[in-house]
């Protein structure tokens, strides 16, 4: 698949052979910013794209130029990331619609608060729709902060974190969450994990074996206030070499036990697990 939702092609004049011979390509995610108004050459644009499918399915007898370079009635699929709240459920998905519906929000970026935080106290379930697997968020800053009634996270495998740099307070104060699968997280670009699981008082186990923390500089209070947490599974990719603030990383993790048992020295210098 190709994720082209940020492509603005209003000044492009030549798209000849743009996707030609991409025989394994099944999906092209785009938005209404992908236009062909000024394109004078689009010969072979979709030549031999044998598996490509949008609203239209590629076949030998169809035009391979810019004719189908669109979402409606074309080979493109809508791919604008959205978050919607309804009846206690927060759903992450991709859409072709550029207008926001009721209780529907854009993804936040950097250290900007997510707009859906206004619903945090009513959220009991989070769903990552299969379409969201093609989204590439850059920040998870306070995504589920104060979702103290959240009990279930569904489809988390559809959250691709390879471009994420900020996971501050991502699950902070998710007090009713007893299990959470973050084993598939790609954290190679993350620099800040402070308070990521802070005050998850019901969480019993965490598998962070896939976490690569080589670029993380802040782990302050990362697991702090998790009294039910007994086990953290990790690998040698979980390093603290760049961490400048690891204070209270394991504060009040009174039942945590690994290579060494929890004691009151709770910073990163006592973080063997």
Regions from the language model: what does each represent?
Residues 15, 42, 140, 167, ...:
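Hydrophobic face of beta-strands forming the core of extended beta-sheets/solenoids
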